[in-house]
């Protein structure tokens, strides 16, 4: 019976590639006015890493627009390494949920990215990335599901399921809860969320 406070990230890649057919072509002009909505937190997973690295005009326009509104830009950069990863992060993409192993995640953490540890229906990375939930890295880690089927949500749960699984893997309960609530709220600048304390919702 608690109120649900839904927040949104604007789509960064519709269509996902120039070869795809979709119901629309959302360039920066199509999404720019939505940044003023109070529930919009930023630009969703920037899948076109090639466009970021090579300064594709449409991609750069979307990044610049998000930054002009002081919004977050979430990443989607599997297997991006070295100078390509440096360029991607330097463009302002400060998170990633596509880490499959510790080396990938640590390389991104070392470059200043936040890691969204994913445990969804198809992609499940919690077991591989649970060692990040330690004093050295936990402040820059949070949980996400990415894609999760409705039946899994009903049967297993959402972020609460990831918390339980993290604890079963040996993560300290307070650390798991912090990654689920506090860290995500801090990342998205939701300053009165993510804690059970006076003044928090």
Where are these regions (language model features)?
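Structural recognition of alpha->loop->beta junctions
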Residues: 28-42, 88-107, 138-142, 171-172
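Divalent metal-binding pocket/active-site signature
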Residues: 45-102, 107, 119-123
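His/Asp/Glu-enriched, well-ordered alpha-helical/loop segment
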Residues: 132-201
């Amino acid at each position: 019976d608690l109120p649900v406070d839904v927040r949104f990230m604007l789509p960064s890649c519709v269509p996902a590639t120039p070869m795809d057919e979709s119901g629309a072509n959302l360039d920066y002009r199509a999404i720019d006015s939505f940044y003023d909505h109070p529930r919009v937190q930023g630009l969703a997973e920037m899948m076109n890493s090639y466009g970021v690295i090579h300064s594709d005009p449409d991609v750069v326009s979307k990044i610049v627009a998000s930054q002009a509104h002081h919004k977050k830009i979430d990443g989607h950069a599997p297997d991006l390494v070295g100078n390509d990863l440096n360029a991607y992060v330097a463009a302002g993409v400060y998170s990633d949920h596509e880490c499959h192993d510790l080396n990938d995640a640590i390389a991104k953490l070392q470059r200043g990215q936040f890691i969204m540890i994913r445990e969804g229906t198809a992609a499940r990375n919690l077991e591989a990335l649970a060692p990040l939930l330690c004093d050295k890295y936990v402040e820059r880690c949070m949980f996400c599901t990415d894609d999760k089927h409705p039946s899994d949500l009903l049967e297993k749960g959402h972020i609460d399921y990831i918390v339980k699984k993290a604890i079963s893997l040996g993560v300290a309960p307070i650390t798991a809860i912090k990654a689920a609530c506090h860290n995500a709220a801090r990342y998205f600048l939701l300053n009165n969320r993510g804690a059970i304390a006076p003044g928090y919702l």
